């Protein structure tokens, strides 16, 4: 039985780098894993930079609707603030 988490309970496959008999294979597997993680990090970095390079229009579909309702939203916020202030005075 192989003690590593990947093979626990199932036994090792034909080629397993976890045993003490093949330390070179374990080292090679670690190098392959490190290279894969590095490639994954590079790809994620490339995608993030590509996303940042493209300018996006913030909320393009909601902007006209927000402009039309902005005075009502401001008035509603003031009414809510007044109500909160009055409720605070009553409870104190």
Curated annotation (Swiss-Prot):
In which broad location class does this protein mainly occur, judging by the first location in its UniProt entry? membrane
According to its UniProt record, where is this protein located?
Membrane; Mitochondrion
Name this protein carries in UniProt: Activator of apoptosis harakiri
**Short sequence motif named BH3, residue ranges:** 33-47
Q: What is known of its domains?
A: The BH3 motif is required for the induction of cell death.
What are the GO BP annotations of this UniProt entry? apoptotic process; cellular response to potassium ion starvation; positive regulation of apoptotic process; positive regulation of neuron apoptotic process; positive regulation of protein-containing complex assembly; positive regulation of release of cytochrome c from mitochondria
> What binding partners and quaternary form does the record give?
Interacts with BCL2 and BCL2L1. Interacts with C1QBP.
Keyword rRNA-binding belongs to the record: no
Functionally, this protein is described as follows: Promotes apoptosis.
| PANTHER family per UniProt | ACTIVATOR OF APOPTOSIS HARAKIRI (PTHR15056:SF0)
Topology in the membrane? Single-pass membrane protein
Q: Which UniProt keywords apply?
A: Apoptosis, Membrane, Mitochondrion, Transmembrane, Transmembrane helix
Give the domain of life: Eukaryota
What's a GO cellular component annotated to this UniProt protein? mitochondrion
- Transmembrane regions listed in the UniProt entry: 70-88
Q: Which InterPro entries match?
A: Apoptosis_activator_harakiri, Bcl2_BH3_motif_CS
């Amino acid at each position: 039985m192989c003690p590593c988490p990947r093979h626990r309970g199932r036994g090792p496959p034909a080629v397993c780098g976890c045993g003490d008999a093949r330390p070179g294979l374990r080292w090679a597997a670690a190098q392959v894993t490190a290279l894969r993680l590095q490639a994954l990090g590079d790809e994620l970095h490339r995608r993030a930079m590509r996303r940042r390079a493209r300018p996006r229009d913030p909320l393009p579909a909601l902007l006209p609707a927000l402009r039309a309702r902005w005075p009502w939203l401001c008035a509603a916020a003031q009414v809510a603030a007044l109500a909160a202030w009055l409720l605070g005075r009553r409870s104190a």
